[in-house]
């Protein structure tokens, strides 16, 4: 299916690009999330009329994410978790736990924005975590996992 992207989509394209994707991806994800429209003549004409407005909205989102990234970048989050004597946690620290701790510090972060490439944190200590505020704004946050010995 040919679609017009209404915003930047990771690994697909930028605003205004006409790309071919699988029908299910377009119908079930991109179109319902208002990230794309079918590439018909009418949709292309309407897109060209709204292009400046959509670019302005995209620039505002990027500016807001950059401002939040400057505040959030380099910050440290402390999370207390029960741990054994050897420093391994009983359970793990997930992206939801990190997002919750960031929200308590006053940052608007969702769990889907926290990236843990090696999976949940299972050891006591400091860990570098990436937070993706926008497709172009990714900041590093230090998570200090403090073990409460049982």
UniProtKB/Swiss-Prot annotation:
MF GO annotations: rRNA binding; structural constituent of ribosome
Keyword list, A-Z: Ribonucleoprotein, Ribosomal protein, RNA-binding, rRNA-binding
Database matches in InterPro entries: Ribosomal_bL9, Ribosomal_bL9/RNase_H1_N, Ribosomal_bL9_bac/chp, Ribosomal_bL9_C, Ribosomal_bL9_C_sf, Ribosomal_bL9_N, Ribosomal_bL9_N_sf
Gene3D superfamilies xref list: Ribosomal protein L9, C-terminal domain (3.10.430.100), Ribosomal protein L9, N-terminal domain (3.40.5.10)
Gene Ontology CC terms, in alphabetical order: ribonucleoprotein complex; ribosome
GO terms, biological process: translation
Function: Binds to the 23S rRNA.
Family named by the database record: Belongs to the bacterial ribosomal protein bL9 family.
Protein name listed in UniProt: Large ribosomal subunit protein bL9
Gene designation: rplI
